[in-house]
Regions:
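C-terminal accessory nucleic-acid interaction domains of nucleic acid-metabolism proteins
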Residues: 1-29, 33-35, 46, 50-51, ...
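Flexible loop/turn segments at secondary-structure boundaries
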Residues: 63-66, 76, 141, 173-175, ...
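Short beta-strand
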Residues: 57-59, 164-170, 211-215
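Beta-sheet entry/capping signal
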Residues: 13, 53-55, 66, 163, ...
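Signature for HUH/AEP ssDNA processing cores
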Residues: 96-169, 180-188, 305-306
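A short beta-strand motif that forms the metal-chelation/ATP-contact edge
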Residues: 175-181, 221-225
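Polyanion/phosphate-binding surface patch
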Residues: 52-83
Length: 306
């Protein structure tokens, strides 16, 4: 760290204020620890944030105190940070865009614990280039159901000839992401995702549901497809989650889901770099895929009718 509590990065000088502030009280993790994590993870993480509107999960007083969700860019953000103005109900909102390491470090200094990017990019925010399925268990002890559901989805996506990537949520669930060609709108994508998720629910309605209300889930695993909407987000790959231990949402290989010691909160800011030192990022080639929902739609209808 440079003197005067500033980090020199990307030709920028980012001041770190209150570096000793405890952000994770049960673990003694400080703001500087979070800043250092995001600075080190930036080469892996920034490619998954580039040119996407961001929603920030901020805990300036630590996760032991109430945090807040920030969509609009604060007026004091420096001019060198990229922003994008998008439509919202009744007007517009200007989001931050994280296209470089310095921006990520700056956001960490703002007490930003979690970063949640849109599923679309700034060049056309109305046409998503990612489709997401969020496997969210009702209970802490249903890892087998979460993994099983994700593997069923992978099998179905293979039949649809759609590429699929998976990551931990850093909590109890899994995110399955399909990279798209950004030619369809959000309504079309969400309808596709819902129809596909219904195939899994129809196979085992005692274990999986599309019902978002917890009291109606009756202990079942939610396959959340409602994130596939305009302005909806999910935790970014390598984002810290605001939970004790500072777990991280981590891309994993499909075969890893079957390992005995696997769990969605396995990786934290303390051990993720040991993993990356010996394992390639399973998502590193995601950008090479641009799948077509239009081409897959007839196969999906046949699959659902079977």
């Amino acid at each position: 760290m440079a003197k005067d509590n500033a980090i020199e990065i990307d030709g920028r000088s980012v001041e770190i204020t209150r570096p000793g502030k405890i952000l994770f009280p049960e673990d003694g993790i400080t703001k500087l620890d979070v800043v250092n994590y995001y600075q080190r993870i930036a080469p892996f993480m920034v490619p998954y944030l580039e040119n996407r509107p961001l929603v920030l999960q901020r805990f300036p007083d630590g996760i032991g105190r109430p945090g807040f969700i920030q969509k609009a860019v604060a007026p004091y953000y420096p001019a060198w940070i990229k922003k994008v103005t998008v439509k919202k109900a009744g007007g517009t909102v200007k989001h931050v865009v994280c296209n470089d390491d310095a921006t990520l470090v700056y956001l960490a200094n703002q007490g930003c614990i979690g970063l949640h990017p849109w599923l679309s990019r700034t060049d056309d925010v109305n046409c998503p280039d990612q489709m997401i399925f969020d496997f969210d268990p009702s209970r802490d002890d249903d890892l087998a159901g979460v993994v099983g559901g994700a593997l069923i989805l992978k099998e179905l996506l293979d039949k649809l000839e759609l590429p699929a990537f998976v990551k931990t949520t850093g909590s109890r669930g899994l995110h399955v992401v399909v990279p798209l060609d950004a030619t369809q709108d959000f309504d079309t994508m969400r309808a596709f995702a819902r129809e596909l998720a219904e195939v899994i629910v129809d196979r085992d309605s005692s274990r999986y549901t599309l019902e978002a209300h917890k009291e109606k889930r009756k202990g079942r695993i939610l396959i959340d497809v409602n994130r596939n909407g305009y302005a909806q987000t999910a935790a970014a790959a390598y984002s810290i989650r605001a939970r004790n231990g500072a777990p991280v949402s981590v891309p994993v290989g499909w075969s890893e889901l079957r390992k005995r010691n696997f769990r969605p909160n396995l990786y934290t800011i303390q051990n993720i770099f040991a993993r990356l030192d010996k394992t390639d990022d399973p998502w590193k080639d995601m950008g090479k895929f641009h799948a077509s929902l239009k081409s897959a739609a007839p196969r999906l209808h046949s699959l659902h009718a079977a």
